[in-house]
Amino acid sequence: MNQTELLHVNFPHLRELKPFDTAHSATPWLADSDAKHSRKLCASIEEAVRRSGLQDGMTISFHHAFREGDRVINTVVALLARMGFKNLTLASSSLMTCNDALIEHIASGVIARIYTSGMRGKLADAISHGLMDEPVQIHSHGGRVKLLQDGELNIDVAFLGVPCSDEFGNANGTHGKSCCGSLGYAMVDAHFARKVVLLTEALVPFPNMPASLVQDQVDYIVQVESVGDPAKISVGAARVTSNPRELMIARYAADVIEHSGYFKPGFSMQTGSGAAATACTRFMEEKMERSGVKARFALGGITGSLVDLHEKGLIEKLLDTQCFDGQAAASLARNPNHVEISTNVYANPGSKAASCDQLDVVILSALEIDVDFNVNVITGSDGVMRGASGGHCDVAAAANLTIVVAPLLRSRIPTVVKRVTTRLTPGESIDVLVTDHGIAVNPARPEIRERLMEAGLKVVDINALYERAISLTGVPKPIDFTDKIVGVIRYRDGSVIDTVRQVKE
């Protein structure tokens, strides 16, 4: 009887212990000089898919750090279609106009279910008109992490595009040919996925540091020609505006911040992804320099404008879950106080601490806002999905002052309405609406209203803005929907705050 067998006899609770075999019995690759370093490398995406164990009915995930420049989602799903996969759940952190190619793979049954922060373009239009049998689950950035944490969403294989990685899987978005900057979305997928496949443009020597995605999270690595076009990150929702009306609204929003009571040394802010929201940053610079007020940090999607303020010493730290342009991506590589964070650290209501809980001021956009301050950023005036939840309801709930910026009208369609088509962020989370026709303050914040009026800002009742809008356009004709639910709007805690119904033909 050997020593291990004696242990089994004398200590029954140790029966699972095994006797020593060889030094490499548990790590056979260490006995192979090639496999020791290259065992994760795959010659093709197809090889990585086969090694991952992906099967019909499983869940695949992607990140959208390249936004409209992404080349991974369409490439991988097209391959899975050729390989014969069916009934998959697609869990991308968001979907863009560039993902219209998914329509054929939904129609053919390759993709049966979708979890996403949002969608745009022909894909969103097709789904809004009933393309899918199951409704799309639309979550916030923080809410996505909570769905993973709670076990409703389980990622079987994550396909994560990165500009560079070493042969063990240490990867970042700040080096290589196609720098996208922060990999805040991908960090969550790498943590929760059963298997992680990296698609990398460059294979660089070990150790590739700093590592946003770490070697102990990565299973397989495929070198590909391109994962994305970083030049297309700052288009669409993340574009920079020169529109005079949007700039005027941005200036008004900066005035609101200045006189809100929160504009003081050490304040914190997030400026969102909409054109007027991002433009607000440049007007804040002028006010900060004039008053000598410096911000402790800025959070969220980071823009070149925020980088400028950081490098001028006006913002101490940048906490970055997504870079909205090349300037931000370059800053992340060189500025030690420009720090990458995951969406879990950013805004997960189920995390042990979310950075958004430290926010003083946030500027957000809206497709619609109603007289009860409920906000819609998902469906357009035609009822078609054309936006994304993003971090909207996350930061709106957490910040001390939540400001929504929007024009009163868009193409003769009212933005201020009696009731939003789709409710994403509840009115209780919205404090101020800034439009080109005036500023409305939620009645729950009378102290803010008083401060703004004392400063001489044009404060009006939100009902007056609604009346002004319909006096210019008339009351919009109600949208015709069928009874079929095509989208489920999940609040950040996972609850259902609204649904989207199919648009009638």
What are these regions (language model features)?
Residues M1-E505:
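Conserved alpha/beta enzyme-core scaffold
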